[in-house]
């Protein structure tokens, strides 16, 4: 979990669904990477869609396109070969990042999402 800087009593949340992960923590980053590798090597998935992906790229308050999260995935011999799809926003300040994700990433955008949703609903 992630606490508000300088306030150990309140959670920091840019997801709108509860609490944000402290992705800059080495232990959290390792847990994410181990989980992703497991799904690729053991369950044979070929890619991932990251909901509220901007949250994963927040180093402190801003979204960092050079964050450790992106860097370690790009350097990983297994994960760098998977399909990576970002929902490129969250509810935090500066969280709308359509067109701002690094190479190897595809971006899910709201217009596409709404079109697909309307199609399936009829």
Model-derived features with residue positions:
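Substrate-binding/active-site clefts of carbohydrate-active enzymes
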Residues: 1-45, 49-75, 94-95
């Amino acid at each position: 979990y992630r606490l508000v800087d300088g306030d150990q009593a309140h959670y920091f949340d840019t997801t709108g669904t509860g609490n944000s992960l402290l992705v800059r923590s080495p232990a959290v980053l390792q847990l994410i990477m181990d989980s992703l590798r497991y799904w690729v090597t053991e369950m044979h998935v070929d890619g991932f869609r990251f909901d509220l992906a901007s949250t994963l790229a927040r180093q402190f308050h801003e979204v960092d396109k050079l964050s450790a999260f992106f860097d370690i995935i790009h350097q990983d011999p297994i994960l760098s070969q998977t399909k990576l799809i970002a929902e490129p926003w969250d509810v935090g300040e500066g969280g709308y990042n359509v067109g701002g994700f690094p190479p190897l990433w595809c971006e899910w955008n709201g217009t596409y999402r709404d079109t697909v949703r309307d199609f399936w609903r009829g």
